[in-house]
Amino acid sequence: MDAKQVRERLIAMGINFFSADLFIAYHRERPKIWEEFAAAALALCEDGERRISAKHICEKIRYERQMEKRGEFKISNSMVSLYARVFVLKYPEYADRIVLKEAVGPKVEAA
């Protein structure tokens, strides 16, 4: 899924245009965040976790990095829910396990 598709799908999920564009720019500058987020989320799903919050995923990464002395995991709190939405788009088989809060923007049909 390319950046344009991600943007369109986020907007269809109720994320406003500004936040979707901000997320795409943020991701382009920090692609490693997605790699770690997706890997941690997949591990939790495959371990049988039934309800997983995006905040929990980020805190798990932060904790593991601290224990392994790999440096801090820095992610803007305003981006956490967007990473969760992208995870659900990329891995729809786990959509029922990822807790998503209601987006406050208007829902529109994706192109």
Where would I find each of the regions flagged by the language model?
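Intrinsically disordered, low-complexity serine/threonine- and proline-rich regulatory segments
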Residues: 1-35
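Charge-enriched amphipathic alpha-helical scaffolds
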Residues: 55-96
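Positively charged, polyanion-binding regions of nucleic-acid-associated proteins
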Residues: 21-56, 62-68
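Generic structural signal of hydrophobic/aromatic residues within well-ordered alpha-helices
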Residues: 6, 19-23, 37-41, 57, ...
